[in-house]
Amino acid sequence: SVNQTAEEIVESFLLSQDNSLEKRKLKKIFEPQNVSDEYDFWISHTAKECKRNQFICFFIDQPTGYKENVSAELKKRFWMTPPYEDYTLSLDNLIQISSLYNNWLREYTINNNLNFCSLSEKLEPNTDNFFDDAHFSENGSKKVAKILSECVKFSIDLSII
């Protein structure tokens, strides 16, 4: 409806998509051992462009609700498991995949002397921080901004020394 608030629109969307871990009857297993070639390509390409142009770039991992200690309320809002499919992956698969990508990015930045900020371990997986699997609530966005500003400040302070 035209008079819906942004919060009501989001809630309406979540209710139509949510609880995919329980609602989708078809369960598939996907346990990649490496990040996708496309992800590797684009991260590498971005890093090369940063160095070539002498940009100060920051690489940031992706916080998600995919944690063992995810709140029951947030877990019911999961829909990106994957999105728009008739099947779901298990929470264990989702944890493994998100950890694989976040750990790969951390290692890549260390090995290539790039700035890295870790968010994934700093946001509790609950509805105070997330609307759903990976989208921040307003409060979560504020926490992300604070964490990132501290990370950038720390990195800049180190480069001055």
Question: Where would I find each of the regions flagged by the language model?
Answer:
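Histidine-centered active-site loop/cap adjacent to the catalytic His
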Residues: Y39, N115, F130-I161
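Conserved beta-strand segments of alpha/beta enzyme cores
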Residues: I56, N113-N115
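Serine-dependent acyl-ester chemistry module
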Residues: S1-R106, E124-T127
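Structured segments of extracytoplasmic/periplasmic soluble domains
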Residues: T46-E49, Y108-N111, K122, I147-S159
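Active-site-adjacent bridging/hinge elements
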Residues: N115-T127
